[in-house]
């Protein structure tokens, strides 16, 4: 195993880990990145959304060779009951710009490319290596890691934990608590392959245009969760995720929900005739601002999913991961350049910089929303989608019924389902959590 000491060790080679390692290496630090997979991205078969602004800060010319799928020109939001959907669509030619704002990607391909940039920057990347625990001195300061390789103890001034939402290393070292089931979602995803021209016809796309569909409603059977559909070049990424605590409580299975989503009348035609080649499950942080653990300590910082950095409202994760990794690396570099120890006091600069960025500002804005949706999941993910769907059908159906009577019928349905007190209470709580 490696005997030398490093300025920094990064555990994990996802978005946050690669961003941190790349930044550290470019700053001239001696950095080692450890990844348990065969290569970066080997365990990430799913599709995802890439936010260009954050990647440009790391790799300005990424569009020249990054494995991008489609640039997004349309966003669709669906509220589903069992037989229909009520939708809000936004599509703009402004997104057919020279440098598009968002792309769909296949993580296995993209992460591998991202890792190549890390290696080009001079970092040492060691794959197929599992970090089993953190090495701490007599005072509890993290001074390195132990791996599953023989003689696998490696030392560094600071360790960057980018190990994903489970955060087992930090938990094992008593640096943080294990994430609560209500703060983590389990998402199951499939890749449905179709000819490129078929995808473009079904989604009304031209060239490399792409679309994202996000869906909520009865597909989650009253649990807190959402479904999603991403159009890639020659495949469709489709999946659904719900809180782990809801799966435990209801006994529902992720695969059962996925089949329910795929068979929905609004979804089935989009994937008809497709070939499923890949299936994966993935844990996603959903606890929001109040679930963020301790972000730094003596000799360590935590970034990305491991830090619960995910904006569930806007479905932003990869940009928060890349930004937190970059900011953590910048903070470490500043401490290093001042020749100061990697103490908790000095590494608190990382949190200060996060607070000054959009990352924690956005998460703080929606700090009360995750708990509100979880506590009221039956109403927001079951009752209201059914009521809204019936209201829309009542509105567009022409059957000779006077419009005044139709309006009364719709209002009566809402009041009978939730009462006036419940309706105003839900609206007030939702508005307060959103502001």
Curated annotation (Swiss-Prot):
Keyword Flavoprotein: yes
Cofactor: FAD
InterPro entries hit by this protein: FAD/NAD-bd_sf (IPR036188), FixC-like (IPR039651)
Keyword Cytoplasm included in the entry's annotation: no
Keywords: FAD, Flavoprotein, Nitrogen fixation, Oxidoreductase
One of the Pfam families matching this protein, by short name: FAD_oxidored
GO molecular function: oxidoreductase activity
Gene Ontology biological-process annotations: nitrogen fixation
SUPFAM superfamilies: FAD-linked reductases, C-terminal domain, FAD/NAD(P)-binding domain
Family: Belongs to the ETF-QO/FixC family.
PANTHER family linked: ELECTRON TRANSFER FLAVOPROTEIN-QUINONE OXIDOREDUCTASE YDIS-RELATED (PTHR43624:SF2)
Its job: Could be required for the formation of a functional nitrogenase Fe protein. Probably accepts electrons from FixA/FixB and reduces a quinone.
Protein name as annotated: Protein FixC
Lineage summary: Bacteria, Pseudomonadati, Pseudomonadota, Alphaproteobacteria, Hyphomicrobiales
Gene: fixC
